[in-house]
Regions:
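S-adenosyl-L-methionine-dependent nucleic acid methyltransferase catalytic domains
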Residues: 1-209, 214, 218-324
Length: 324
């Protein structure tokens, strides 16, 4: 399809597979914005089975976490991101991934990452298929205690991750708090409800100058404040971790130029991708779950078709940002 004057050609694509592998297929400095929410540690399976056997005696005996293995070694032993036996391993694997992703992010690009926290328990339930309710099936994970890993301890995973990213060379520009006005009911009666999550904004460190990156403050929330109050929205196909548009649209508008490329390497059912397309950005997503990848791909196709029907864009080729 040929573009008419004033019409934007947009591309959208979802690739099924492990983000650690798929990121290698992208061109250097091809992405304007990475906007994503990795699987939270130890909370949900999203239908993918992991194994705790890789931790060996450390899991059975407790104590200090052994040195984190590379993600490839962990995966080769059957491990899944988010189901590591130690939160330290999980944080290490996230930092490892984003170190690799830095190659594809433009020098003027931004990285926005959403993370929530959790409490430690040696035996804990993992919600199946990412659903939030209490009636769905669950699996059980075992995590060894030791150090700060103590029963009922709030783990501060977002803070530990942010500091690890700083240590890895990223510049942290914002810690945006997403406050949820009506959190889901919880059975605990000895603590307050977790009713907020973090959105971290990272940019490249420049070796000889202050960081220079694309940013349009007029695209952010009114007043440019670092707290947004917004209720979660229902996801597609039972996915509970979908982004509310009111939370992610300001990230897209402020941190990527029109016609830029937005990458969500853990795209779930594709909410960030369809919102990016609506805002006249190209969109690319990676998803490990075959079910969710299919849902996301369908949503992207529908969004592109709708935009084309309204005359807002023409559909481009789908090889966005990839090696030829």
């Amino acid at each position: 399809m040929h573009s008419t004057p004033g019409e934007q050609k947009l591309s959208g694509e979802v690739r099924h597979g492990d983000a650690f592998d798929l990121i290698g297929g992208l061109l250097d400095r091809s992405v304007d914005l990475i906007l994503t929410s990795p699987p939270y540690w130890g909370l949900r399976t999203y239908g993918l089975d992991g194994t705790m056997e890789f931790a060996g005696s450390a899991v059975r005996g407790g104590g200090s976490a052994p040195e984190p293995p590379s993600y490839e070694s962990y995966r080769d032993a059957g491990g899944i991101l988010g189901l590591e036996p130690f939160p330290e391993w999980y944080i290490s694997h996230l930092v490892e991934f984003f170190a690799g992703a830095s190659r594809v992010l433009k020098r003027a690009g931004s990285l926005w990452i959403n993370l929530g926290d959790t409490y430690f328990a040696r035996w804990a339930s993992i919600r199946d298929q990412g659903r939030q309710g209490y009636s769905e099936g669950r699996t059980r994970r075992r995590a060894p205690a030791g150090g700060y890993r103590h029963e009922k301890q709030l783990l501060l995973i977002p803070a530990r991750f942010a500091i690890a990213m700083q240590d890895a060379g990223w510049i942290l520009r914002n810690d945006l708090i997403w406050a949820k006005p009506a959190p889901l009911p919880r059975p605990e009666s000895d603590r307050l409800k977790l009713s907020h999550e973090h959105w971290f904004h990272f940019v490249h460190r420049q070796p000889s100058a202050r960081p220079k990156y694309y940013y349009d403050l007029s695209g952010s929330e009114e007043g440019g404040r670092d707290v947004i109050i917004c209720a979660p929205t229902a996801g597609r196909a039972g996915h509970s971790a979908a982004f509310p548009p009111a939370v992610i649209r300001p990230r897209i508008l402020s941190s990527s130029p029109p016609a830029g490329l937005v990458l969500d390497p853990f795209c779930g059912t594709g909410r960030a991708l369809t919102e990016s397309l609506e805002l006249q950005r190209n969109a690319l997503g990676f998803e490990l779950s075959e079910v969710y990848a299919a849902v996301a791909e369908s949503a992207v196709r529908a969004s592109l078709a709708d935009l084309a029907a309204k005359g807002h864009c023409s559909v481009g080729h789908s090889d966005v940002g990839c090696h030829q």
